Amino acid sequence: MRFRILFLALAVSVISIPAAAQKLDMELFEAMKPRNIGPAGMSGRVTSIDAVHSNPDIIYAGTASGGLWKSTSGGINWTSLFDEEPTHSIGVVAINQSNPDIVWVGAGEGNPRNSQSAGNGLYKTIDGGVTWKHLGLEDSRNIHRIILDPNNPDVALIGVQGPAWGETEDRGVFRTTDGGKILEKVLYINEKTGIGDMVVDPSNPNHVLAAMWEFRRWPWFFKSGGEGSGLHESWDGGQTWTELTDDDGLPKGELGRMGLAFAHNEPDVVYALIEAKKNALYRSDDGGKKWKMINDDDGVNSRPFYYADIYVDPENENRIYRIATAVHVSEDGGKSFRQWQPGYASNGIHPDHHAFWVSPTDPDFIMEGNDGGISITRDKGGSWRFVENLPVAQFYHINVDNEFPYNVMGGMQDNGSWIGPAYLWRSGGIRNSYWQEIAFGDGFDVSPDPDDSRYGYAMSQGGSISRFDKETGNSSRIKPLHPDPDVFLRFNWDAAFAQDPHDSATIYYGSQFVHKSENKGQSWVVISPDLTTNDPEKQKQSISGGLTYDATQAENNTTIVSIGVSPVVEGILWVGTDDGNIQLSRDGGGSWTEVGSRIKGVADESWITQIKPSPYNAAEAVAVYDDHRQNNWEPYVYRTRDWGRTWERMVDADDVYGFALSFIQDPVEPNLMFIGTEFGLYVSIDEGSEWTKWTQGYPTASTRDLAIQEREVDLVIGTFGRSAWVLDDIRPLRELAANGVSLLEEAVHVFSTPTAYQASNIQAEGTRFRGDAIYSGQNRPTGARITYSINPDEYEEAEDDDEEGEGDHDDDGDHDDEDDDDDGDDDDD
């Protein structure tokens, strides 16, 4: 009772500890939950949309790496449904329209770009998403299509695309007739061929077309097309299949990805957008038996590996929507197309489209998803509403400054680089308008100038780097050049950047060389030889793509992807490459030694996605290996304590789920460490001997990057799909790491407290009453934060002892008055 009075008007975190607890049990940390601060204004990649035909206010939206979301208000507000499932990547969502509480979900997006994530199979709910059952296909990785039989809810066809990064038999079309208990493979070509598209005849659920697609991705090359690609037809609900050929009017030779669509009002009309030696749109007027080419303009199918879908107006077989970089529409059966949506205008819609839904009863009502979220029109494209409250931004990197309150910053997939507050003294939460875009393109590292965080550095694809002024908006390009103009610089899609902790004017940047600037990017010098393997077989990005070239620099390889500068001793540099090298310089770049080859147990050519020098020991560093690009999803994190002579593995698949992406060690308590993987956040309080997944308030998320704001002792988390998070005040974890879990056996323990500030929150900027459609990130609670633990057994024993002794002494009356007030009933007697 005394403790309750102590904490009046304070923000209190309570950790209730059973006496027998010896491990870091997440159930005990309910009061320590990270805050999702957003942003949502740029949203993120949406992969699938479906709505209930009889009540289209009920919408399900799948995202590339941000989970599954549901709206029951026509897209005004949204609920995340997959926070606790072991996957966050959604390939397809399909509603059983005869019973909309039944929803099927295929995990793993079907757009195999370089940043594609993956899932773990097939899911189903029978209660509208409250609970989910995993049905199998664990190794399918990417499920792209689901067709439900409208006459039998137990019958479904599952179109598995399969992983881009490897060759497996877990591909093709699967069929179930018992609601998913048994999944039979009914169409299989080879280990490289999966589903590109699959559609059903609206007049005959037994008539199905499946476009099989052979493709393969390597870190340095992508190939679309092969002998396995082709169009297949079934007339018995997918039990048996027949391949259509050039004898039926399809193009000759090697084929790639195809998009398919039936016309609902005229089911004999079918369209196929086909990648071939000459990409073209084909049409059938007899339900798919015979085909003819109707449009082979150069732009009709410009980037099929990333988007190749077509849709037909349900009331007009000649009105076709083609989704690609922009959405285009044809009114003449595909003979000609025009851009349908506004582009880079003030009312523009984000490019790169992947999901499309047209109401079958109202063709004016359309929803589409792209790399920047969801847009909705109710007048067939005359006007659009952008859904600005889906916090599914895909951060590649995260960082913080030291302003007061401090800011969080980072770059995102196809959505630029942004800076926004970690918390603020305003009502209304952290709104999208409080975030400032400081660079466009695909954003990567963002780093504040330690001398003045008004300025900073922002990276984008192709090695682009700029120095920005966030007050004026001015930005200047500072990309380094090689002194020899004949030397071509190879920059990774996500090139390495680092600041020197010993000199605020010195920065480093990685191509195949390490570039150093001592004047904040005004000039550069090369301080290393080529630190990669320089394998010419991995330098074919300019011809990447297969049937359709796609030379965007996304496959740049034999490059530097991580640079770590020791904060302990000046001049110690660690460098990681995308082809497996770890290079060490102990003299500021004068000489280099390759030390990664001494690591045993990790595959050659793995990416060293991060390399973190120890804040305590100059000879120590931690290397985070990411080998998923060789279809290996295990975590690999290695530590050296002797300049790379020997290495020890810090995690394995029994402790940590998913390939590792990020690591950070607390700069004050060496026993406290965090690891981010493709599927979550893990914490260790014993220097990596044991890891615990952080589940309190944190979803399954690709945890790309981690930062610690040292003044306020916050862990800041950048996710690739769920925006940014802040775990406020990790001092309790520091104390547990320093003293062990035995600390929690005390009856009551009060942890070190952060500084509290008395502040009066001012009104939010802009709209005061925001309703539900305007996003608001979680602000830090007001008041003083005190975290304490209670061991119920010890506390009750101490309380009993205290009560037994109360009759043996008097006090000044305050305690007795408190007890009287608490008891209450005695006064009435």
Each language-model region and where it sits:
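Short amphipathic, basic-aromatic surface patches that mediate peripheral association
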Residues: I786-G807
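Sec/Tat signal peptide C-region and signal peptidase I cleavage site
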Residues: I17-A21
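Beta-propeller blade termini and top-face loops
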Residues: Q22-I774, P781-T782, N791-D793
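Intrinsically disordered, low-complexity acidic Ser/Thr-rich regulatory segments
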Residues: A551-I560, D819-D829
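Generic low-polarity alpha-helical segments
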Residues: M1, S16, G428-I430, F497, ...
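Bacterial N-terminal signal peptides that target proteins for export
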Residues: M1-F7, A653
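Bacterial N-terminal signal peptides
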Residues: F7-S16
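Long, acidic low-complexity intrinsically disordered regions
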Residues: D802-D828
